Design a protein with these regions (language model features):
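Polybasic, low-complexity RNA-engagement segments
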Residues: 1-150
Length: 150
């Protein structure tokens, strides 16, 4: 639904460099190193707004969850919100809940306890680790929402 009306910027080698939505907003770019997608701050907002399922807050890990319903969402405690908004990484001890399809190396969205998007980044763990570990970096953030959404 999002990419139906998008335009693409093609580089000199014939590869897609950027994906632009119908309003002219750069929403994502392919990563050549691993084939993943780098989502921009505005792109994360657009994609997150299309989400229809709530974050699974029961804390139960489901190893057979598969691909899920889009990029996984990770919910953090209120204490971590101001740091994530400024582009700081998410540490395990501050995670409240996450989608069961969270996988290491994949893009995920970071939300506060009310479900408001506060950042996005690359997960360093799967859902089981996110809910069980207490020390270390769970998500390396790729945004500074405090500057993007003033």
């Amino acid at each position: 639904r999002i990419i139906d009306s998008c335009t693409y910027i093609i580089g000199g080698t014939g590869r897609v460099k950027n994906v632009i939505d119908k309003n002219g907003t750069h929403i994502l770019s392919p990563r050549l190193t691993d084939g993943g997608l780098s989502i921009t701050d505005m792109g994360s907002k657009i994609i997150y707004d299309c989400r229809t399922v709530p974050v699974d807050g029961d804390g139960q890990y489901q190893p057979t969850s598969g691909f899920g319903q889009g990029p996984a969402v990770l919910m953090v405690q209120q204490d971590a919100v101001e740091f994530v908004l400024r582009g700081r990484n998410v540490f395990y001890g501050f995670i409240v809940a996450c989608d069961p399809w969270l996988k290491a190396g994949q893009t995920c969205f970071i939300v506060d306890e009310q479900g408001a998007l506060i950042g996005h980044g690359l997960a360093q763990c799967d859902a089981d680790e996110a809910l069980r570990f207490r020390k270390g970096i769970a998500v390396r953030t790729r945004s500074d929402f405090s500057k993007t959404f003033k």
